[in-house]
Amino acid sequence: MNCIPSPISERKIQINNEDCIGKENAFHTIPRESSINLTPHSTNEKKVLSEVNSNKIDSLQLPRGKLQRDSTHLEKTRKRQLSNDSTDPIEPKTVKKIKCHQWKNLDSIEMDDPFMVAEYTDSIFSHLYEKEIQMLPTHNYLMDTQSPYHLKSSMRALLIDWLVEVHEKFHCLPETLFLAINLLDRFLSQNVVKLNKLQLLCITCLFIACKFEEVKLPKITNFAYVTDGAATVEGIRKAELFVLSSLGYNISLPNPLNFIRRISKADNYCIETRNMAKFIMEYSICCNKFIHLKPSYLAAMSMYIARKIKNENSKWDETFIHYSGGIDIESDPAFKDFISELVEDIAVPDTNLDSLRLKYKKPKHGMVYFKVFDWCKQKR
């Protein structure tokens, strides 16, 4: 198998014995902590445009308290003009501009398409926003050095980089990679794993994700082969049962790509922007600084950066707030901080993710890495 990536054991990476946590058991379970409850922000309601005596004023939106007074004023003016036999059109002398917080209902355009199930879209995504909170790791076990499950960021980066390479060689779906990383992080956030069992855990998470997402998955012998002896077929099967039971068989992840596609609707489905957003989102998921953030939040961050790369003057208006699940940049100062941190990490990486960069340098992914990297380097 020429396409099989080199095992971790052949890579020039030094691992200290102190990186290994846990001496007695390969997988040692400690009770799971409660996850943080995050709820998406609510969106602003539509204001209704009014008609005054059959004269439609499309560009002016009037407050409710002012509507009746202006209507009476226009009626008096009209009678006065008619009494003077004037034929000039009646127009207000001044028009006060009123800021209107509205979002465009783009789902209504797809009502006639049965495949888009537009009438159920809001209910579906409301469920996904609730479900994604349940699928988060209990905490960021990489950044929390006081955690009993703490693992060095360099070790996770090594595992993720190898996982991306194996995923690419097996020609799996993007959703499979995201689910595998989610399973890995959730398990490591509540279990202590010995160093020599980390690769077994990594390939097992990919094996579970393939079973869940793929129509035709590689043979289990191929999963064991790419580990170069670190995992056996029997070992993968036993680890699979242990991982699933530890996670309560809860593996239905609201996929980050669903949120990217949702926000992309507000961007008129721009292919170039969405390709850049896919790379940025995949990078953020692989990066050790953002594993505690919701997929919808990472999707919004990725689309925001991608749109800025495409057009520096792009705005995150009410439509984007609605289709991102209520993420308002102006009222969320942490959002801008995470954006700056992500841009900085892409420009000057803290972790080794060479396989991911190489993946998005290829023509089949639009070679978007170069454009994203150049922009981030200028903005850092």
UniProtKB/Swiss-Prot annotation:
PANTHER family: CYCLINS (PTHR10177). This is S-phase entry cyclin-6. Keywords: Cell cycle, Cell division, Cyclin. Involved in G1/S and or S phase progression. Interacts with CDC28. SMART domains: CYCLIN, Cyclin_C. Belongs to the cyclin family. Cyclin AB subfamily. Coiled coil: none annotated. GO terms for biological process: cell division; G1/S transition of mitotic cell cycle; positive regulation of DNA replication; premeiotic DNA replication; regulation of DNA-templated transcription; regulation of protein localization; traversing start control point of mitotic cell cycle. The lineage of its organism: Eukaryota, Fungi, Dikarya, Ascomycota, Saccharomycotina. InterPro entries: Cyclin, Cyclin-like_dom, Cyclin-like_sf, Cyclin_A/B-like, Cyclin_C-dom, Cyclin_N, Cyclins_cyclin-box. Gene3D superfamilies: Cyclin-like. GO terms for cellular component: cyclin-dependent protein kinase holoenzyme complex; cytoplasm; microtubule organizing center; nucleus. It comes from the Eukaryota. Signal peptide: none annotated. GO terms for molecular function: cyclin-dependent protein serine/threonine kinase regulator activity. Pfam families: Cyclin_C, Cyclin_N. Residues 63-91 are annotated as: Disordered.
